[in-house]
Regions:
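Segments forming oxygen-rich coordination pockets for charged ligands
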Residues: 1-48, 52-64, 73, 78-81, ...
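Residue-level detector of alpha-helix initiation sites
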Residues: 26-27, 90-91, 115
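Short amphipathic alpha-helical segments
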Residues: 33-35, 57-58, 95-98, 121-123
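Short, solvent-exposed amphipathic alpha-helical segments in soluble enzyme
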Residues: 35-40, 99-102, 125-127
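A general structural motif
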Residues: 63-70, 75, 87-91, 127
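Extended hydrophobic-aromatic, low-complexity segments
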Residues: 74, 93-96, 109-110
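ADP-ribose/adenylate-binding Rossmann-like module
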Residues: 82-87, 98-123
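Adenosine-phosphate binding glycine-rich loop
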Residues: 111-192
């Protein structure tokens, strides 16, 4: 339970708090973290790379410099946890995803093109994950809203996390350049 008073509002939270673990502390992570804070997530950002971690400055978030897979294991993720990997570095993203997909997290996702996502799934099959565990991975991460800029991509990511959190069934058909298309390896969710 958490009790807080900011001089105007008395707030008491019962039960587990929703948390978002972001793998990577780059520009996109800043927007994702800020929006997640606005949605009242406890945000933990993990990046062992000094060039990113040293410049992290989002108030109200926790920064971890440990290896992402170690953090995911240490946090003992539960059904109120979401993990999103956005580094574009398989050495960081894949190891964290490997651990997150074995957890009861309600959402696990990774940034990347459809082709990169397909390649990631093939890499994960080489480890001790079942196909059903790998099918829990949301990738490319985010709803297909035509996002191009980091803030738009963050909106897309948090929209998908919110939909999954609320049990909304997501369609694999979306719009690209105003035309309805099916998801395949040649289309991407965002321009990253």
């Amino acid at each position: 339970d958490e009790l807080s008073f900011d001089g105007e509002t008395l707030r008491c939270v019962y039960g587990p708090r929703w948390r978002l673990i972001i793998i990577g502390a780059g520009q996109l992570s800043t927007y994702v973290a800020q929006m997640a804070k606005a949605l009242d997530y406890h945000v933990i950002v993990c990046d062992p790379r000094a060039e990113y971690a040293d410049t992290w400055d989002v108030p109200g978030t926790v920064l971890s410099r440990e290896m992402p897979d170690d953090l995911v294991v240490a946090l003992k993720l539960d059904a109120h946890s979401a993990v999103v990997a956005v580094t574009h570095d398989p050495k960081l993203d894949d190891l964290a995803l490997l651990e997150a997909l074995k957890s009861p997290s309600f959402y696990v996702g990774a940034l990347g093109s459809r082709l990169n996502s397909q390649n990631r799934r093939e890499r994960l099959l080489l480890f001790d994950l079942s196909e059903s565990e790998i099918n829990l991975l949301h990738g490319p991460v985010g709803l297909r809203i035509g996002s191009k800029t980091p803030p738009e991509i963050a909106v897309s990511i948090l929209a998908e996390i919110t939909a999954v959190r609320h049990g909304v069934e997501l369609d694999t058909v979306g719009l690209v350049d105003g035309k309805e298309v099916s998801a395949d390896a040649s289309t991407s969710v965002c321009a990253v």
